[in-house]
Amino acid sequence: MARAIWSGAISFGLVNIPVKLFSAVQKKTVRFHQLDAKTGSRIQQKRVNPQTGEEVPYEQLVKGFEVSPDTYVVVEPDELAAIEPKKTHTIDIEDFVQIDEIDPIYYDHPYYLAPGTGAGKAYSLLLAALRDTERVGIARVVIRSKEQLVAIRPRDDVLTMETLLFGDEVVSPSDLGELPDPDEV
């Protein structure tokens, strides 16, 4: 049986529907490791300063953001904590749009939403309303310390939640170079 990876509530207006979140996909990939050909032992990665050639202990590592080639701004842990979104355990629906208003290129990762304890009727009502009106709920949720834009939509007898890419994360076709003119085919 699948295990919930998050629990919270779908919220819009005065409505609050407890739900559990499950990943809708299980990627089947083979993971290879680097091994020593002579002994078959797994190789370890070491943190080495390229300027000194010395190994850097974990306690000396800091996070930095590259502002230009080889120029970094160090970001302190308290600065990272200050910008971390507040965990609310709520999927806040901000709008409802027609299903065909979302270009599929913006869909990122699918999840299933199952009703929480005592939420069966409210869950079923939302599922039926979205299905009957062919609408999708556009919402925000914090998962693993990251705020996500998501779409809540019906799929058969279950609500799905798909993380959405922001516009600046999608590569424009104009960045691909010269494409053939479709009128000249």
Regions found by a protein language model. Give the residues of each.
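Boundary segments of small protein-protein interaction reader/adaptor domains
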Residues: 1-185
